[in-house]
Amino acid sequence: MGKIIGIDLGTTNSCVSVLENGTAKVIENAEGARTTPSIIAYANDGEILVGQSAKRQAVTNPHNTLFAVKRLIGRRFDEEVVQKDIKLVPYKIVKASNGDAWVQASGKDMAPPQISAEVLKKMKKTAEDYLGEPVTEAVITVPAYFNDSQRQATKDAGRIAGLDVKRIINEPTAAALAYGMDKAKGDHTVIVYDLGGGTFDVSVIEIAEVDGEHQFEVLATNGDTFLGGEDFDMRLIDYLVDEFKKESGMDLKNDPLALQRLKEAAEKAKIELSSAQSTDVNLPYITADATGPKHLNVKISRAKLEALVEDLVTRTIEPCRIALKDAGIDASKIDDVILVGGQTRMPMVQKAVADFFGKEARKDVNPDEAVAMGAAIQGAVLAGDVKDVLLLDVSPLTLGIETMGGVMTALIEKNTTIPTKKSQVFSTADDNQGAVTIHVLQGERKQASQNKSLGKFDLADIPPAPRGVPQIEVTFDIDANGILHVGAKDKATGKAQSIVIKANSGLSDEEVERMVRDAEANAEEDRKFEELAAARNQGDALVHSTRKMVADAGDKVTAEEKTAIEAAVVALEAAVKGDDKAAIDAKVEELSKVSAPVAQKMYAEQQAEQPQGGAQQAEPEAKHDDVVDAEFEEVKDNNKQ
């Protein structure tokens, strides 16, 4: 069997590695560089350029040079962050027929996985040239905070590139693997702070020796899938554009050629300011007007850059705080801090991390190469070449389904070790309901609508039965790639339906922030919503049982009683439609009060009818303690596609 290579598919740069003689080796590309720019260009003659060659011609071909496409992978066109990106990139981002964000180059619309596949092909070829044999299998890394659809899209990119993706692993976990393999034995806890070109992740990882085996266990992970070096570049570009506008009155944002030159200059200046205190951005002939050519010349100090990006650096600290809290660990208990991603070379970032964790980060881990090296080690583990490593990763976000009252019922909590499988029994909301819709959600909020919808599917042909009687077993199964498989089964008939969740979209910046904003901010709102949902469910159940009781009682109920009960039922139904919990509680009490005499009358009659001596108990209405009422839409046959 051939080697399983490790690929770090980055937003800005990508890297490929392979395990040789027990050590992960980063492979140099055809240009002699250890990393390859994640840039793809479509030349006029139809040639596809990847990496440095694409970057070199970007200024003369801005519309057909695609960069930072990873930020669009698994995302919807209408998302705010995508709309923001549209204004900042010289190439065209378009809306696909399914609502996804695609890109346009050379008059062709293409999906982000197609573009990423070109980078993966280059990585594959780099490895093949070095190894002298075909490469068909790879481990590809993704940001730890990538959601299900983004992981699926990355796997698709691998398939398009002709690679069998043996495993998708999280970037911080891969970096910890590269760091921990050659360290002294013994248990220690590390933080991996990964600020790359387009994404930010932080993971708390425990490295332990268990029966002579290196065990890497992720305790918690957090992050932001739309925060990275590209955002730092954009701040600098905005500043340069504003300075030029003040001086010349011309807006360079409308000039794709100038924008491409600015991007290159901003990236270069940012890198220079990591070691120098100031730098000059000098772009002659940046544009022209009727009076002749215009030149841009701006001096930037490190302090100015730091002022421009201060809030971006601050934004990375809150996920660190949440990850520590989720892991149940104090910052003082962290043994080592590992910095990954090129943006962590910025002194301001290093200082912010050192201040928060109370210790300097290690300098012996290459931030550009550690992730690919870790992926290569995982590839060797899967191939059986490395036998003393066990990797225990986690699911970054809570997964569940929508249940009665618009509540999200969690099946798999965030930071659960994967692979994992969890089942729970639900039931129907209406009598004789013939089908249920399973609505799968990902996120941290109690209100279903506040979470990310991953998909829906139907389980039909449920035999007629009173509500609450059918037992529908829903099973969530997350594989080692962090990809979700969902199944539903009617326990009475054995009829089952299952899907691999293939959502069309990824998480927007706002959605991610909404989901992971911790309990402190949303606890009160979530608690109120849960209480309101519970009150509504109680009201619905009382309406249903009261109407059934009145129907069963027949002429034993007087006309006055019937009128009073019906009025109370109508009042409760109206209250349940509102958002006032106190009003619902009051109407529940009112209905209970007016229906109590009828209930007592029915109970007395039942007692009288029972045979004397060892009276048998009337069989209660079917009820299962482990059944959670779930709100499902009945799928009408004439609506089926």
Swiss-Prot record:
GO terms for molecular function: ATP binding; ATP-dependent protein folding chaperone; unfolded protein binding. Residues 620-641 have a biased composition (Basic and acidic residues). Keywords: ATP-binding, Chaperone, Nucleotide-binding, Phosphoprotein, Stress response. Residues 602-641 are annotated as: Disordered. The keyword ATP-binding applies. Induction: By stress conditions e.g. heat shock. Gene3D superfamilies: 1.20.1270.10, 3.30.420.40, Actin, Chain A, domain 4, Substrate Binding Domain Of DNAk, Chain A, domain 1. This is Chaperone protein DnaK.
